[in-house]
Amino acid sequence: MDSSSSTPSTVWQQESLSQSSCAEILVQRCPACFGGISFGRPLDDGGDIHVATDGNFHHRHRRSAGDCPSFYEPSYFIPKAQVDAVGCHIDHARHHPSKSSQSGVPDEAIDQCEASYEAADGQKQKAAMDNFDDTRLMMLICRHDIPLFFANIDMPGEQQKFSIALICHLFSLLPSQANVVVLYDVGCILARSLSRVSFPARSFLF
């Protein structure tokens, strides 16, 4: 989380400049964002890539409709198993001792944000789970409003595993040195949670 910004954001930063390229699927979706070959721009200069994530509560799937026969491999939706694996890691990490972290945002302010935003309540149920098996979508878009990836939310609340799974999936398709700013309306809460657990692979800077 870049706490100096007025817009909640999470920054997942690498260190040095590399010459490489993004996965072709990203280049096809937005050449302006992902068509470059030079990565490692400092965050003070804006980083390399800007994306945003949020939940949409108006896209639901009725349980009674069932599942259609599988006839293609979805390229926009990440698998439920991938999301659940991230959730299992988060649950496991929360049982570890908290890491020491220094946040630029006081805990009191973050607590007020958590109390005032429905999206920050991971247990808030906004659709009847007995009627819908997928109650909303979590999405990741680039700075040009182009959808990159989606995840079906299949439980009450906008739990953190959905946004983190999308971010992890994005980074699996980027050069290892890419610096990315992730905007999220409750990013301050997500950043505090991540600062208290151990997360593998790349490091989050807040």
Question: Predicted segment positions?
Answer:
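Hydrophobic core positions in small helical hairpin nucleic-acid-binding modules
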Residues: 1-206
